[in-house]
């Protein structure tokens, strides 16, 4: 198993970029590959750092330069296209890969024969100090449809990535979320309970400015989720959840979405009632025929237009009279 780390670069502080590249080179350990794509940086010290990396002639380090500034999705696709590994691991240009956690991911992928895995991570500030640890749950499709909790580090099959067409341009800021939703339609990701990534939270990135998420990132995440439901042939209304961070500020999106799925008008529900005719029980000193009581409650529950989509199945004892069972249903108008 060979992994290609994909590192898109644009106007990155060389000090932070040095930490990032050194961390992935350490994790690569001369076995795996690191593909750095400079998306036409106009910052001189960033370009100078990329030049030094190229001239260093480090085994397993490849440098690609885009002819223009095309965005992160384009850059990641360029890196993936050039990658020689059979697995891919995207890494943000200001983050750090933790070697022991990455190695555990490789062992888990091999043991479980999985095509996609994600790890736990920690968030750090601009100087690398701990903000919070993020210990994630195992895969939950419902949770993924609410927020992009998988995040970093992800390692997934290049074949899977290419089958899906890679990252989609136009989803910048939420391109990882869009890809994760599409991959989840093909396979189930494996959660590796190891910290393999330091996610650096900067004041200003493509997806956020300070605490506030960018409007384009939130909207792209909403579109990715809506299209996911459409591919699943579900009708859903998706809206970002708003949260008031401070007493003096307006509610704002926090990267969480609420999806309301419309009921399928053609679907039917089968209500199965195993019973013995004539069975009674005293409730509040009042004898109740259990089947009659059950059917009465069901009748109260359905409106007329719903009743046509409900099927009642009575499972009676061998000695019971089927005709009496049918009569009980008719009496309740079901």
Predicted features along the sequence, with ranges:
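A conserved acidic beta->alpha catalytic loop
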Residues: 38-47, 68, 92, 313-329
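Conserved nucleotide-sugar donor-binding catalytic segment
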Residues: 141-226
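N-proximal low-complexity "stem/linker" segments adjacent to membrane-targeting elements
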Residues: 1-23, 240-297
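Short, acidic, metal-binding catalytic loop of nucleotide-sugar glycosyltransferases
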Residues: 22-31, 293-309
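Short alpha-helix within the catalytic core of nucleotide-sugar-dependent glycosyltransferases
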Residues: 21-22, 46-47, 77, 85, ...
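Glycine-rich, basic loop-to-helix element that forms the pyrophosphate-binding segment
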Residues: 66-83
């Amino acid at each position: 198993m060979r992994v290609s780390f994909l590192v898109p670069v644009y106007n990155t502080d060389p000090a932070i970029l040095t930490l990032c590249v050194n961390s992935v080179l350490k994790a690569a350990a001369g076995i795996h590959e690191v593909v750095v794509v400079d998306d036409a940086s106009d910052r001189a010290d960033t370009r100078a750092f990329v030049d030094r990396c190229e001239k260093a002639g480090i085994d397993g380090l490849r440098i690609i330069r885009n002819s223009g500034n095309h965005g992160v999705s384009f850059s990641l696709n360029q890196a993936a296209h050039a990658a020689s590994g059979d697995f891919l691991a995207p890494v943000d240009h200001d983050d750090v890969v933790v070697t022991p956690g990455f190695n555990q991911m490789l062992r888990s992928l091999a043991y479980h024969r999985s095509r996609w895995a994600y790890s736990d991570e920690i968030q750090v500030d601009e100087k690398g100090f701990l903000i919070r640890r993020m210990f994630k749950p195992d895969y939950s499709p419902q949770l993924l449809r609410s927020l992009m909790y998988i995040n970093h580090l992800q390692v997934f099959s290049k074949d899977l990535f290419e089958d899906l067409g890679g990252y989609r341009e136009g989803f910048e800021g939420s391109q990882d979320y869009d890809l994760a939703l599409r991959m989840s339609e093909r396979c189930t990701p494996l959660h590796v309970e190891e910290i393999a990534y330091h996610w650096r939270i900067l004041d200003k990135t493509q997806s956020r400015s300070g605490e506030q998420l960018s409007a384009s990132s939130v909207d792209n995440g909403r579109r990715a989720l809506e299209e996911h439901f459409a591919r699943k042939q579900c009708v859903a209304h998706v809206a970002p959840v708003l949260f008031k961070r401070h007493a003096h500020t307006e509610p704002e999106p926090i990267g969480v979405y609420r999806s309301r799925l419309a009921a399928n008008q053609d679907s039917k529900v089968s209500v199965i009632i195993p019973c013995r005719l004539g069975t009674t029980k005293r409730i509040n000193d009042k004898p109740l025929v259990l089947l009659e009581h059950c059917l009465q409650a069901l009748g109260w529950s359905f409106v007329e237009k719903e009743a046509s989509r409900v099927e009642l199945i009575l499972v009676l004892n061998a000695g019971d009279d089927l005709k009496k069972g049918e009569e009980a249903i008719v009496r309740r108008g079901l």
